[in-house]
Amino acid sequence: MYGSTKPLDAATGGLATRQAVSLSPGRRAWKRFRRNRLGFFSLVLFLTLVVLSLFAEVLSNDKPLVVNYQGQFYFPLAKDYSEKTFGGDFETPADYLDPFIKDKLRQGANWAIYPPNPYGPKTINYFAKDPNPSAPSPDNLFGTDDRGRDLLAQLIYGFRLSVLFGLALTVIGVVIGVITGAIQGYAGGKTDLVFQRFMEIWGSMPELYLLIIFSAVFAPSVALLLFLLSLFGWMGLSDYVRAEFLRNRQLDYVRAAKALGVSNLQIMRRHILPNSMTPVVTFLPFRMSAAILALTSLDFLGLGVPPGTPSLGELLNQGKANIDAWWISLSTFAVLVVTLLLLTFMGDALRDALDPRKVDHA
């Protein structure tokens, strides 16, 4: 009575297929990535946490964001002021958590706007009622560590350090890995053989022992740790890129480019590299997870960042040393697990989105 719907279905399917084909590979991958709700939600949440951590000084600091004292505005985050500026007796830097200073900033028309968490990562709460480490309280929502420092502030700054360190180590590893892998895969022959033997020797070096030696010789710093881990963090990706270049250099479009007189550098950069980036992009979230774990592990062992620097590994070490202070281990472990889970979910979704065997459906 109503007729067949097969021609309409066929036409609709053909239109959807043509639309999918008309999309660029990047847009098709992004479309598949967004379809993975867990991966997309993880990306949004992770980026939100990272952006918030970049403004850690605004969210968690022991200095007010802005002060209005006797009709004048002061910005303690941008400039240090002495206690005398706010009615004190000394030229020492003002302690804005001191009840005397806080009372001065409340008198009359004076006012001050503090960050949501009025503690910095190194701020010691000398006015706490309980001995350190103290349990969560209205003054310190996540409690304090064994030195009296606010735990929430350390988690915020430690998360930022871990993410930025992981990102920097990942970028350095990708740059070195792509360059070395591309040279090996495209050149082949003796060049590839020499690189492979060098990587075998380099990879057999005891990385942990070298870290211990350098930590004993040089003053610990984030830059030193980043340099040492970068010496070994590129080899895994280099093998993937090498395999892609070995495969792609035999394809017809590379032979056609050579026949047209295109230079080897241009062929590698403009033709082979874009078609070899799938394993590189898929590798990024997992590489970043490994970098964050490496930093946390080394800090836990005392081989990481300088003492006093807020870090997740140092907090885990404090939790081990203070078993009764459950809030230290629990909160730090939760931050670390959530971070690694978000990166893992993003990596799985990215791998599926870049899988050429996946077919788009309307």
Predicted feature residues:
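Gly/Trp-centered helix-boundary motif
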Residues: 1-174, 178, 182-183, 308, ...
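Alpha-helical transmembrane segments of integral membrane proteins
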Residues: 144-362
